[in-house]
Amino acid sequence: MPRIIGIDIPAKKKLKISLTYIYGIGPALSKEIIARLQLNPEARAAELTEEEVGRLNALLQSDYVVEGDLRRRVQSDIKRLITIHAYRGQRHRLSLPVRGQRTKTNSRTRKGKRKTVAGKKK
Protein backbone atom coordinates (compact mmCIF):
# COMPACT_ATOMS: atom_id res chain seq x y z
CA MET A 1 0.00 0.00 0.00
CA PRO A 2 1.57 3.32 -1.03
CA ARG A 3 1.54 5.92 1.73
CA ILE A 4 0.69 9.43 0.56
CA ILE A 5 0.67 12.34 3.04
CA GLY A 6 0.26 9.87 5.89
CA ILE A 7 -2.64 7.93 4.34
CA ASP A 8 -2.41 4.37 3.06
CA ILE A 9 -4.13 4.27 -0.32
CA PRO A 10 -5.35 0.93 -1.74
CA ALA A 11 -2.63 -0.61 -3.89
CA LYS A 12 -4.86 -2.81 -6.05
CA LYS A 13 -7.16 -0.04 -7.26
CA LYS A 14 -6.46 2.28 -10.17
CA LEU A 15 -4.64 5.48 -9.28
CA LYS A 16 -7.58 7.76 -10.10
CA ILE A 17 -9.73 5.81 -7.60
CA SER A 18 -7.02 5.33 -4.96
CA LEU A 19 -6.43 9.07 -4.61
CA THR A 20 -10.08 9.62 -3.67
CA TYR A 21 -9.41 7.76 -0.39
CA ILE A 22 -7.67 10.94 0.79
CA TYR A 23 -10.07 13.35 2.53
CA GLY A 24 -10.60 16.38 0.30
CA ILE A 25 -9.82 14.67 -3.01
CA GLY A 26 -12.75 13.62 -5.17
CA PRO A 27 -12.85 12.19 -8.69
CA ALA A 28 -12.36 15.54 -10.46
CA LEU A 29 -9.47 16.68 -8.28
CA SER A 30 -7.89 13.24 -8.61
CA LYS A 31 -7.93 13.56 -12.42
CA GLU A 32 -6.44 17.07 -12.19
CA ILE A 33 -3.59 15.92 -9.92
CA ILE A 34 -2.79 12.97 -12.18
CA ALA A 35 -2.76 15.25 -15.25
CA ARG A 36 -0.46 17.79 -13.54
CA LEU A 37 2.03 15.05 -12.64
CA GLN A 38 1.62 13.33 -16.03
CA LEU A 39 0.87 9.94 -14.44
CA ASN A 40 -1.16 7.13 -15.99
CA PRO A 41 -4.66 7.21 -14.40
CA GLU A 42 -5.26 3.56 -15.37
CA ALA A 43 -2.11 2.31 -13.61
CA ARG A 44 -2.54 0.60 -10.24
CA ALA A 45 -1.37 2.51 -7.16
CA ALA A 46 1.09 -0.29 -6.36
CA GLU A 47 2.89 0.40 -9.66
CA LEU A 48 3.95 3.91 -8.55
CA THR A 49 7.69 4.39 -8.21
CA GLU A 50 9.23 6.00 -5.10
CA GLU A 51 10.00 9.10 -7.17
CA GLU A 52 6.35 9.41 -8.31
CA VAL A 53 5.10 8.97 -4.73
CA GLY A 54 7.52 11.71 -3.65
CA ARG A 55 6.27 14.08 -6.38
CA LEU A 56 2.67 13.31 -5.39
CA ASN A 57 3.42 14.05 -1.72
CA ALA A 58 5.19 17.30 -2.58
CA LEU A 59 2.35 18.51 -4.81
CA LEU A 60 -0.39 17.69 -2.28
CA GLN A 61 1.47 19.39 0.57
CA SER A 62 2.28 22.54 -1.39
CA ASP A 63 -0.79 23.21 -3.55
CA TYR A 64 -3.81 21.53 -1.95
CA VAL A 65 -5.60 21.63 1.40
CA VAL A 66 -6.38 18.01 2.29
CA GLU A 67 -6.79 15.67 5.29
CA GLY A 68 -6.10 17.20 8.72
CA ASP A 69 -5.67 20.77 7.48
CA LEU A 70 -8.99 20.65 5.62
CA ARG A 71 -10.81 19.10 8.61
CA ARG A 72 -9.38 21.83 10.89
CA ARG A 73 -10.38 24.56 8.42
CA VAL A 74 -13.99 23.29 8.24
CA GLN A 75 -14.21 23.10 12.05
CA SER A 76 -12.78 26.60 12.48
CA ASP A 77 -15.23 27.98 9.89
CA ILE A 78 -18.14 26.46 11.82
CA LYS A 79 -16.77 27.84 15.13
CA ARG A 80 -16.45 31.28 13.54
CA LEU A 81 -20.07 31.18 12.35
CA ILE A 82 -21.19 30.25 15.87
CA THR A 83 -19.16 33.00 17.57
CA ILE A 84 -20.41 35.78 15.25
CA HIS A 85 -23.99 34.56 15.87
CA ALA A 86 -24.69 34.05 12.17
CA TYR A 87 -27.92 32.21 11.34
CA ARG A 88 -25.94 29.25 9.98
CA GLY A 89 -23.90 29.19 13.17
CA GLN A 90 -27.04 29.03 15.30
CA ARG A 91 -28.36 26.13 13.23
CA HIS A 92 -25.06 24.30 13.80
CA ARG A 93 -25.24 25.04 17.53
CA LEU A 94 -28.78 23.66 17.78
CA SER A 95 -27.93 20.60 15.64
CA LEU A 96 -30.55 21.48 13.04
CA PRO A 97 -30.29 21.46 9.23
CA VAL A 98 -28.23 24.44 8.06
CA ARG A 99 -29.28 24.82 4.43
CA GLY A 100 -32.98 25.59 4.66
CA GLN A 101 -34.43 22.07 4.73
CA ARG A 102 -37.77 21.44 6.43
CA THR A 103 -37.74 20.23 10.02
CA LYS A 104 -41.39 19.43 10.81
CA THR A 105 -40.79 15.97 9.37
CA ASN A 106 -37.52 14.39 8.27
CA SER A 107 -34.12 15.85 9.29
CA ARG A 108 -33.65 12.88 11.63
CA THR A 109 -30.00 12.51 10.66
CA ARG A 110 -29.20 15.99 11.93
CA LYS A 111 -31.50 15.96 14.97
CA GLY A 112 -30.63 12.46 16.14
CA LYS A 113 -32.87 9.80 17.65
CA ARG A 114 -36.45 10.81 18.47
CA LYS A 115 -37.16 12.09 21.98
CA THR A 116 -40.52 10.63 22.92
CA VAL A 117 -42.93 12.96 24.71
CA ALA A 118 -45.68 11.44 26.88
CA GLY A 119 -49.26 11.91 25.67
CA LYS A 120 -51.65 14.31 27.40
CA LYS A 121 -53.40 12.88 30.49
CA LYS A 122 -57.19 13.05 30.68
Curated annotation (Swiss-Prot):
One of its GO terms (cellular component) is cytosol. NCBIfam families: uS13_bact. Located at the top of the head of the 30S subunit, it contacts several helices of the 16S rRNA. In the 70S ribosome it contacts the 23S rRNA (bridge B1a) and protein L5 of the 50S subunit (bridge B1b), connecting the 2 subunits; these bridges are implicated in subunit movement. Contacts the tRNAs in the A and P-sites. Keywords: Ribonucleoprotein, Ribosomal protein, RNA-binding, rRNA-binding, tRNA-binding. One of its GO terms (biological process) is translation. It comes from the Bacteria. Residues 94-122 are annotated as: Disordered. Belongs to the universal ribosomal protein uS13 family. GO terms for molecular function: rRNA binding; structural constituent of ribosome; tRNA binding. Part of the 30S ribosomal subunit. Forms a loose heterodimer with protein S19. Forms two bridges to the 50S subunit in the 70S ribosome. SUPFAM superfamilies: S13-like H2TH domain. This is Small ribosomal subunit protein uS13. Gene3D superfamilies: 1.10.8.50, 30s ribosomal protein s13, domain 2 (4.10.910.10). It comes from Chlamydia trachomatis serovar D (strain ATCC VR-885 / DSM 19411 / UW-3/Cx). Residues 101-122 have a biased composition (Basic residues).
